UniProtKB/Swiss-Prot annotation:
Similarity-based family: Belongs to the AP2/ERF transcription factor family. ERF subfamily.
CDD domains: AP2 (cd00018)
Keyword NAD: no
Alphabetized UniProt keyword annotations: Activator, DNA-binding, Ethylene signaling pathway, Nucleus, Transcription, Transcription regulation
Organism: Arabidopsis thaliana
Task performed by this protein: Probably acts as a transcriptional activator. Binds to the GCC-box pathogenesis-related promoter element. May be involved in the regulation of gene expression by stress factors and by components of stress signal transduction pathways.
Keyword Nucleus in record: yes
Subunit relationships: Interacts with MED25.
The name this protein goes by in its record: Ethylene-responsive transcription factor ERF098
Primary residence: nucleus
GO cellular component terms given for this protein: nucleus
Location in the cell: Nucleus
DNA-binding region(s) in UniProt: 19-77
One biological process term in Gene Ontology: ethylene-activated signaling pathway
Gene name for this UniProt entry: ERF098
Higher taxonomy: Eukaryota, Viridiplantae, Streptophyta, Embryophyta, Tracheophyta
């Protein structure tokens, strides 16, 4: 009866710890990190053994981002995809108010000649054709 209580206690302790993608806990307490390499038919790529789960998870994130880029599923996505602040959303032609009047008129002209460009990824042909048709109808 005691052994079943011990195993349930160990299981509840494991559940309380944060679980990370690509990280396993070794019986002696260290954390191992590995990732599947898509270019080698899913073979395991050993990343190392670490003192903490967070270190192992960050090693996994670095490898995943290097292998899969923006398509990677990460443990800490905010470290690779920072939030966009207001200043990064400003267009490049939004200059300070100290610019001369001649500079502001050229800025106004360039604003009129610019048009918005949206970049879409992984859209099927039908959606792209509809977008192009709607742009042609506007003209």
């Amino acid at each position: 009866m005691e052994s079943s209580n011990r195993s349930s206690n160990n299981q509840s302790q494991d559940d309380k710890q944060a679980r990370f993608r690509g990280v396993r806990r070794r019986p002696w307490g260290k954390f191992a990190a590995e990732i599947r390499d898509p270019s080698r038919n899913g073979a395991r790529l050993w990343l190392g053994t670490f003192e903490t789960a967070e270190e192992a998870a960050r090693a996994y994130d670095r490898a995943a981002f290097n292998l899969r880029g923006h398509l990677a599923i990460l443990n800490f996505p905010n470290e690779y995809y920072p939030r966009m602040d207001d200043y990064s959303l400003r267009p490049p032609y939004a200059s300070s108010s100290s610019s001369s009047s001649s500079g502001s008129t050229s800025t106004n002209v360039s604003r009129q000649n610019q048009r918005e460009v949206f970049e879409f990824e992984y859209l099927d042909d039908k959606v792209l054709e509809e977008l192009l048709d709607s742009e042609e109808r506007k003209r």
